[in-house]
Amino acid sequence: MRKITLIRNRRAGKAVYGQLSFEMRNREYALETFSMPSLENADYLIPAGTYPVERTWSPRFKKFLPLIENVPDRDGIRIHRGTIPEHSKGCILLDLAGMSNITILFNQLENEEENAQIDIVEEFTA
């Protein structure tokens, strides 16, 4: 099972930033992340914990994307590219600056026979 880790470490207004990392072929990859509330998900942060991740078809994006499952009182939470709050409805957005790492992650999830899991950790500094 592929393990993905998200460490949330910085707040700026309502936005929450972090670093998403995963290992592939003994090499660590990292991506900057961004989460922002929306009208549909005012209580938007996924609680810290471990969640299964499946690659499923997204009708909104019209392609396969990672879907985080078993989030309490939430559904449809995905990991996808984005740079502004309007790109998210409570999802984990990946910074486009890390485009090659995003492609590696998505390709790896696509080619995995097993699903992945994500560990979400909070390490905010005062």
Predicted regions and their residues:
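Cell wall/extracellular polymer interaction/catalysis modules
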Residues: 1-116, 121-126
